[in-house]
């Protein structure tokens, strides 16, 4: 972990150095480029002070390739003349016949002032951009310095050995490390010396050295980051699949499913349960209409058949809409399950952080509260009254996805699944909880009796 952290910090420092060096070179070049363009923007003043031999030498393009490097004035003049000719002037067939007056007329006083104003605006704009970039680079450098200081204090504390062991144990779950999320694990493995003794000695040593305040501050920040990351991740797991599936159901799936079902499908019911319900409701409607006819003592058989037909059409429309909703529920459940699976697979490290945070909360409770919550969960799922709750839950799920309600299947599920849960829970108590905290097990058995 230390090696990967040091490598990452080194890469960030190296990138920061390269960026600063590049900005320095660009600033130097931009500053001197505008100065040279302004200083030598009128090469006629240089040309008038040249000798006839030099004038004849610079009139040819070959001088650019054979110029004397020791003659800086001639070099500057020819370079600027050649540059302005390439970017602003048209080429003639004969370079020797090019009139210098066309070149020199460009560099009058007005163009000189305009170029000066443009250069000042350009440099002020670039300076603002450089100031923003320098502020960002300074922020990055300050963050790296804070990271180095925190790392120094963290690894110098005697009690930080326990926290480092937690980090190493949790980060061994994955191959890579997320530096943005501080991760810890809630408990350590069982050693020969009880960890309560080592923890007390470490805290006593920290009090003697005078590092307790910094240690408490660091643990508080670590717990804060862990809690925020866990709550954020659990919020995504709970609300993001529901939010995406609801939007896709309303705006994407529902119009297409309705069009497909009403145009391509000729059936109304998906299963026999809907047919039985529709037939039962139709019989009830007919009985009510016949009862009204008998009470009123009127013979309107034609009106009665029309009313029965209207009620039948209404029932057909109702159960047709129910069939569409069943298909939509099935598709949205598949979308929600897919999104939830993707979030769990992508956020394995955040899931480990959430797991450690939940375990930390659980272990921070007293033994009585731990036993109370264990009893509450066990009685809720595998207790005496749990079969009725399981029947309601399974029936609602079957109705939601469009399956027929079968009491024999539900009874078989209720008679087997809670037994499996009870076996798994007892194994967890025997295997894990009994070693972790025997006092919780004793309190649990006492309250259960």
Swiss-Prot record:
Q: What is its main location?
A: plastid
The entry's localization annotation reads: Plastid, Chloroplast inner membrane
UniProt membrane topology term: Multi-pass membrane protein
GO cellular component terms, A-Z: chloroplast inner membrane
| InterPro entries the UniProt entry points to | CemA
Q: Does the keyword Nucleus apply?
A: no
Molecular function via GO: antiporter activity; proton transmembrane transporter activity
Q: Name one GO biological process term.
A: potassium ion transport
| Catalytic activity entry | K(+)(in) + H(+)(out) = K(+)(out) + H(+)(in)
Segments traversing the membrane: 9-29, 227-247, 326-346, 374-394, 410-430
Keywords in alphabetical order: Antiport, Chloroplast, Hydrogen ion transport, Ion transport, Membrane, Plastid, Plastid inner membrane, Potassium, Potassium transport, Transmembrane, Transmembrane helix, Transport
Superkingdom of origin: Eukaryota
Family annotation (Pfam families): CemA
Q: Which family does it belong to?
A: Belongs to the CemA family.
Q: What does this protein do?
A: Contributes to K(+)/H(+) antiport activity by supporting proton efflux to control proton extrusion and homeostasis in chloroplasts in a light-dependent manner to modulate photosynthesis. Prevents excessive induction of non-photochemical quenching (NPQ) under continuous-light conditions. Indirectly promotes efficient inorganic carbon uptake into chloroplasts.
What protein am I looking at? Answer: Potassium/proton antiporter CemA
Q: Which gene encodes it?
A: cemA
């Amino acid at each position: 972990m230390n090696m990967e952290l040091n490598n990452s910090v080194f890469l960030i420092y190296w990138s920061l150095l390269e960026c600063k060096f590049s900005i320095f070179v660009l600033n130097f070049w931009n500053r001197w480029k505008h100065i040279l363009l302004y200083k030598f923007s009128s090469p006629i003043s240089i040309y008038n002070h040249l000798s006839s031999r030099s004038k004849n030498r610079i009139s040819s393009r070959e001088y650019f390739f054979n110029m004397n490097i020791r003659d800086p004035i001639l070099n500057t003049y020819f370079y600027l003349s050649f540059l302005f000719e390439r970017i602003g002037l048209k080429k003639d067939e004969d370079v020797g016949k090019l009139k210098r007056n066309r070149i020199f007329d460009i560099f009058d006083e007005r163009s000189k002032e305009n170029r000066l104003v443009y250069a000042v605006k350009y440099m002020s704009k670039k300076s603002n951009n450089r100031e923003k970039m320098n502020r960002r680079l300074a922020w990055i450098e300050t963050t790296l310095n804070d990271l180095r200081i925190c790392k120094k204090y963290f690894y110098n504390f005697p009690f930080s050995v326990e926290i480092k062991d937690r980090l190493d144990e949790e980060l061994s779950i994955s191959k890579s490390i997320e530096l943005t999320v501080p991760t810890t694990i809630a408990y350590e493995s069982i050693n020969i010396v009880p960890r309560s003794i080592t923890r007390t000695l470490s805290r006593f040593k920290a009090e003697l050295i005078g590092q307790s305040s910094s240690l408490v501050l660091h643990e508080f920040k670590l717990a804060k980051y862990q809690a925020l990351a866990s709550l954020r991740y659990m919020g995504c797991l709970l609300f993001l699949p529901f939010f995406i599936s609801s939007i896709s159901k309303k705006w994407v799936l529902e119009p297409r499913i309705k069009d497909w079902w009403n145009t391509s499908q000729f059936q109304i019911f998906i299963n026999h349960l809907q047919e039985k319900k529709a037939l039962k409701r139709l019989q009830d409607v007919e009985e009510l209409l016949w009862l009204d006819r008998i009470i009123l003592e009127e013979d309107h058989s034609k009106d009665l058949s029309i009313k029965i037909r209207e009620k039948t059409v209404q029932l057909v429309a109702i159960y047709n809409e129910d069939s569409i909703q069943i298909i939509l529920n099935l598709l949205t459940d598949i979308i929600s399950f897919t999104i939830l699976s993707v979030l769990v697979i992508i956020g394995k490290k955040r899931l480990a952080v959430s797991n450690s945070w939940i375990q930390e909360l659980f272990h921070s409770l007293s033994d009585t509260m731990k036993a109370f919550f264990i009893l509450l969960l066990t009685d809720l799922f595998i207790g005496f009254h749990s079969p009725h709750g399981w029947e309601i839950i399974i029936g609602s799920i079957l109705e939601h996805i469009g399956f027929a309600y079968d009491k024999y299947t539900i009874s078989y599920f209720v008679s087997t699944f809670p037994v499996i849960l009870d076996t798994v829970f007892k194994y967890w108590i025997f295997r894990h909880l009994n070693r972790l905290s025997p006092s919780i097990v004793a309190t649990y058995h006492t309250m259960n009796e």
